[in-house]
Amino acid sequence: MSTEEFYNTIVIGGGQAGLAAGYFLAQQGQNFAILDGESRIGTAWRQRWDSLRLFTPAQFNGLPGMPFPGGDNYFPSKDEAADYLESYALKFHLPIRPDTKIDRLERDGDSYRLSSTAQSFKAKNVIVATGAYQSPQYPTFAAQLDPEICQLHSFAYRNPDQVPAGRVLVVGAGNSGAEIGLELRKAGREVWLSGRDVGHIPANQLGKYFGGRPYWWLISHVLSIDTPVGRKMQAQVRQHGNPLIRSNRKDVLNAGIQVAPRLAGVQAGKPLLQDGRTLDVDAVVWSTGFRPDYQWIKLPIFNGNGVPHHERGVVPGAKGLYFVGLHFQTALTSALIGGVGKDAQYITRFMQNS
């Protein structure tokens, strides 16, 4: 292993959260580096399904200091999002260290030691910005399905060609599930969409009639941990997922998708719904979200579900350790490209004043 490098602050992750944190650290004149495990900025976006478009309009997708290109109420593609992040890093000359995946973070005296396979680092402060969506989550009974049924997670889904012709069950009725279900239906599949109705925030209509301002104000200020309705929404979102934004339940029904209750388990190798019905399907697409994966952080800062204890991203009892980009960290927008900047600014200011 080469000589250890020391920085005042290290940001782990070069996605939207890490770049936003880097922007404010650069404004402060900090000695810092952004470590990312991929060889190219935006890889996480490029690896999503082919037709994916952001669930929020372009005018709400800018990081601090650089608006997202595109007209109002235009929903950018996932590749446009990736290109934007890459351009952002170049514009602000952010010190990205690609191909540097940290596999261990631990305390070392009054600093933190970070280790990768080829390099060791030390830092007074560490901002973990590895994203809200890490390891695909499946129900425990997924393995009980008949092996003849094709299974894949939304993380691995790219396009309908991966899914055999016939009947498809999409499990999870959030944004990803609804969008994938609509695409499969358009491609000629017979589709069931299983899951709880997560509600709908009509971004299209709000943007059309009010320039989108009430919509963004709602999801970034009202639906935050600072309001009673926001705290209630936080608990709901963490359990059931975000409300639909671009698509809605009416779109699903009009497309001819059959809406089904939540999945209860497996019976005789077939998906079993909560109403007692079993479905005879050829494929299942699990749009069941992601779970946190922080096994590489060797610090006692997590609850029983592997979620870090924090107050607005500040980890109590671990001076100098912070998170940015967590799911509903402070608001419904916390993990979105257009929302991470607010939390990144708070964290970097807090760190500077500590």
Which stretches of residues belong to each language-model region?
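Short, flexible helix/strand-to-coil boundary loops that buttress conserved ligand/catalytic motifs
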Residues: 45-49, 56, 67, 205
